[in-house]
């Protein structure tokens, strides 16, 4: 799946992949609804991570590529 993702791709977070991951444990457990329910845009890529911007007034976040799916 990672081969399909590139800068500018629209993505959605895969809840099953994100839950109980290191990234989830490092975050507040009360994730906002937009995190799983909306799409984001990949702004940058780094090996196995993507910098994702959601279309809400919140900071962009780094997520593992295996936690994302193309929309």
Curated annotation (Swiss-Prot):
GO CC list: plasma membrane-derived thylakoid membrane
Entry keywords, A to Z: Membrane, NAD, NADP, Plastoquinone, Quinone, Thylakoid, Translocase, Transport
Chief site of localization: membrane
Entries under InterPro entries matching the protein: NdhO
Reaction catalyzed: a plastoquinone + NADH + (n+1) H(+)(in) = a plastoquinol + NAD(+) + n H(+)(out); a plastoquinone + NADPH + (n+1) H(+)(in) = a plastoquinol + NADP(+) + n H(+)(out)
Membrane topology qualifier: Peripheral membrane protein
Compartments (UniProt record): Cellular thylakoid membrane
EC number: 7.1.1.-
EC main group: translocase
GO MF annotations, alphabetized: oxidoreductase activity, acting on NAD(P)H, quinone or similar compound as acceptor; quinone binding
Pfam families for this protein: NdhO
Protein family: Belongs to the complex I NdhO subunit family.
Function: NDH-1 shuttles electrons from an unknown electron donor, via FMN and iron-sulfur (Fe-S) centers, to quinones in the respiratory and/or the photosynthetic chain. The immediate electron acceptor for the enzyme in this species is believed to be plastoquinone. Couples the redox reaction to proton translocation, and thus conserves the redox energy in a proton gradient. Cyanobacterial NDH-1 also plays a role in inorganic carbon-concentration.
Subunit (UniProt): NDH-1 can be composed of about 15 different subunits; different subcomplexes with different compositions have been identified which probably have different functions.
UniProt protein name: NAD(P)H-quinone oxidoreductase subunit O
């Amino acid at each position: 799946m990672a081969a399909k993702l590139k800068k500018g791709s629209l993505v959605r977070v895969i809840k099953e992949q994100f839950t109980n991951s290191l990234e989830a444990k490092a975050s507040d457990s009360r994730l906002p609804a937009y995190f799983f329910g909306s799409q984001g845009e990949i702004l940058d890529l780094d090996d196995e991570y993507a910098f994702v911007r959601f279309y809400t007034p919140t900071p962009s976040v780094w997520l593992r590529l295996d936690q994302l799916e193309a929309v």
